[in-house]
C-alpha cells in the first residue's frame, strides 16, 4: 500500500527532492550542483537532497512527507543534460533538459 501526503505543492514543506540514481561520485556531484542552482533561484522553497537506500524507497519516503516533485539524476544526465521529474500524485515521470528545470518546477508549483 502506498502512503501519500497529498498537500498542494504551494504549501508542501519540501517542494522538491533531488535524488541521484546511485552514490556514484559523478552523479552526486552533478546532483548537488543542480540542487544548489535551484536553491539559488530563490523561489522554489525547500529542496532536499537524498542519496540513501534504493530509488524506490526514496520515492516512497518523499511521497509520505508530501514532496510533490522528485528530480532524478542518472547516467543519461551526464550524456544529455536531462533529468527525470517524478510527479507525486500521478507518479508520472518526464525527461526534461536541466536548462528548463527551474522554469518547469516554478510553473508546476505555483500555477
Predicted regions and their residues:
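NTP/phosphate- and nucleic-acid-binding module
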Residues: 1-111
Amino acid at each position: 500500500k502506498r502512503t501519500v501526503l497529498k498537500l498542494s505543492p504551494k504549501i508542501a514543506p519540501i517542494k522538491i527532492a533531488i535524488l541521484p540514481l546511485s552514490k556514484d561520485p559523478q552523479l552526486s556531484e552533478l546532483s548537488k550542483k543542480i540542487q544548489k542552482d535551484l536553491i539559488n533561484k530563490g523561489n522554489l522553497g525547500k529542496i532536499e537532497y537524498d542519496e540513501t537506500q534504493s530509488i524506490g524507497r526514496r520515492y516512497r519516503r518523499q511521497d509520505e512527507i508530501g514532496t510533490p516533485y522528485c528530480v532524478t539524476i542518472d547516467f543519461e544526465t551526464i550524456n544529455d543534460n536531462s533529468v527525470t521529474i517524478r510527479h507525486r500524485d500521478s507518479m508520472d515521470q518526464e525527461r526534461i533538459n536541466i536548462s528548463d528545470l527551474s522554469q518547469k518546477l516554478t510553473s508546476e508549483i505555483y500555477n
